[in-house]
């Protein structure tokens, strides 16, 4: 079947009332960004639907795939745009039925948005079904459990007919909910947390704490790859890589072993807080899960949060670990997350970290060294990368450079 349009249905935009125009415009911008590099199409965003007009050479499968990853889209259907005549609709219905298997069943489903159309829903179903049955003697009607369903939408401008409905990502268009800073560790949880807030229309930049030589270049490349996977959904994402070795070594030198994890997280939060203000973000996002590890008890969260007045969002707070793993697999980050390269959250882990840290004690331990100066140095030396969906890792860039130098 050669389709001439893609019909894009909005997600929760239908709930946005007077703000809908803003949301539709943002979604159209996101669609154009996602389809960059492809040709043979024109995007037409309307109040209640978006239509992608297709030229003969358009790659409909690739366009549909990319659209299915965009937040704010509920579903996509390849459609035929048909004149508002019974003859044109009947011809299109027969065209659909030509693809049906022998002895299969079908039904006609009609939605009549144009209430001024001269035929009602029942009449259209009867006439179109009759046209198909007259043309084929090896298929039959089954209105309850059909093998195929020819869907007909009668709209003001035209008739749209289709069979397939491809699920979209749902949620709200990224760019409608403000900006946050995602603390991206390299584990399973934080990429899922990032995806969850993006699904609510939030733009993210990511921060990663890198402690060479204790953490390797492979650990850094792993985080770049996780960011790249997230960028497939929303376009370029800035990744801020913090040189954290000095701070982490000093914490492990002067803080009581049971409190090093708490203090390390507090230092991370202080750095993140400074960066939040620099980039104009409204909140910090992390992948913490209540009770999962010692630093994620309520007592620990209280002690760690105390160093910032910036809201900290924890989308995975009440998830089971298995739920997080399932989501990680769904979004395509799981296999990268489980690569065995240690990050700064796993090195120097004490044997018996405190689960109910005493706030006064941790403040006392930190008072013996000038961490503010170290934090400022770390922020000043942040490496910022703009990660796109086709971003090459450091190793790939070096290999390509060597090849070019050789040639």
UniProtKB/Swiss-Prot annotation:
It comes from the Bacteria. GO terms for biological process: thiamine biosynthetic process; thiamine diphosphate biosynthetic process; thiazole biosynthetic process; tRNA 4-thiouridine biosynthesis. It catalyses: [ThiI sulfur-carrier protein]-S-sulfanyl-L-cysteine + a uridine in tRNA + 2 reduced [2Fe-2S]-[ferredoxin] + ATP + H(+) = [ThiI sulfur-carrier protein]-L-cysteine + a 4-thiouridine in tRNA + 2 oxidized [2Fe-2S]-[ferredoxin] + AMP + diphosphate; [ThiS sulfur-carrier protein]-C-terminal Gly-Gly-AMP + S-sulfanyl-L-cysteinyl-[cysteine desulfurase] + AH2 = [ThiS sulfur-carrier protein]-C-terminal-Gly-aminoethanethioate + L-cysteinyl-[cysteine desulfurase] + A + AMP + 2 H(+). Its EC number is 2.8.1.4. Pathway: Cofactor biosynthesis; thiamine diphosphate biosynthesis. SMART domains: THUMP. It is found in: Cytoplasm. ATP binds at residues 183-184, 208-209, 265, 287, 296. Keywords: ATP-binding, Cytoplasm, Nucleotide-binding, RNA-binding, Thiamine biosynthesis, Transferase, tRNA-binding. It holds the Pfam family ThiI. Catalyzes the ATP-dependent transfer of a sulfur to tRNA to produce 4-thiouridine in position 8 of tRNAs, which functions as a near-UV photosensor. Also catalyzes the transfer of sulfur to the sulfur carrier protein ThiS, forming ThiS-thiocarboxylate. This is a step in the synthesis of thiazole, in the thiamine biosynthesis pathway. The sulfur is donated as persulfide by IscS. PANTHER family: TRNA SULFURTRANSFERASE (PTHR43209:SF1). HAMAP family: ThiI (MF_00021). Belongs to the ThiI family. This is Probable tRNA sulfurtransferase. The gene is thiI.
């Amino acid at each position: 079947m050669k389709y001439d349009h893609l019909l894009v249905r909005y997600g929760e935009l239908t709930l946005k009332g007077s703000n809908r125009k803003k949301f539709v415009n943002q979604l159209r911008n996101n669609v154009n960004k996602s389809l960059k590099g492809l040709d043979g199409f024109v995007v037409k965003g309307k109040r209640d639907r978006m239509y992608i007009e297709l030229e003969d050479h358009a790659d409909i499968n690739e366009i549909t795939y990319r659209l299915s990853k965009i937040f704010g889209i509920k579903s996509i259907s390849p459609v035929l745009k048909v004149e508002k005549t019974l003859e044109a609709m009947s011809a299109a219905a027969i065209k659909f039925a030509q693809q049906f298997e022998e002895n299969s069943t079908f039904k006609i489903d009609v939605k009549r948005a144009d209430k001024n159309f001269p035929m009602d829903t029942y009449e259209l179903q009867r006439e179109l079904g009759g046209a198909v049955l007259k043309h084929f003697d090896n298929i039959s009607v089954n209105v309850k459990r059909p093998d195929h369903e020819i869907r007909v939408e009668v709209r003001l401008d035209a008739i749209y007919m289709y069979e397939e409905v491809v699920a979209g990502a749902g949620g709200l268009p990224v760019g409608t909910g403000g900006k946050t800073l995602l603390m991206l560790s390299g584990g399973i949880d934080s990429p899922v947390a990032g995806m969850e807030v993006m699904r609510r229309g939030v733009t993210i930049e990511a921060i990663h704490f890198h402690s060479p030589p204790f953490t390797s270049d492979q650990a850094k490349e792993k985080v770049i790859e996780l960011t790249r996977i997230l960028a497939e959904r929303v376009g370029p994402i800035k990744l801020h890589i913090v040189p954290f070795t000095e701070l982490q070594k000093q914490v492990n030198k002067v803080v009581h072993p049971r409190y090093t994890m708490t203090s390390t997280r507090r230092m991370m939060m202080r750095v993140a807080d400074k960066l939040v203000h620099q980039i104009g973000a409204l909140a910090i996002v992390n992948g913490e899960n209540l009770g999962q590890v010692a630093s994620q008890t309520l007592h620990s969260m209280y002690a760690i949060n105390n160093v910032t007045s910036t809201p900290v969002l924890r989308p995975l707070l009440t998830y089971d670990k298995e739920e997080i793993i399932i989501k990680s697999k769904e979004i395509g980050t799981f296999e990268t997350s489980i690569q065995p390269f240690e990050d700064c959250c796993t090195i120097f882990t004490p044997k018996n970290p405190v689960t109910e840290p005493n706030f006064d004690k941790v403040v006392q331990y930190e008072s013996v060294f000038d961490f503010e100066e170290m934090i400022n140095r770390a922020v000043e030396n942040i490496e910022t990368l703009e990660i796109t969906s086709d971003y090459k890792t450091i190793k790939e860039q070096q290999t390509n450079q060597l090849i070019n130098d050789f040639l």
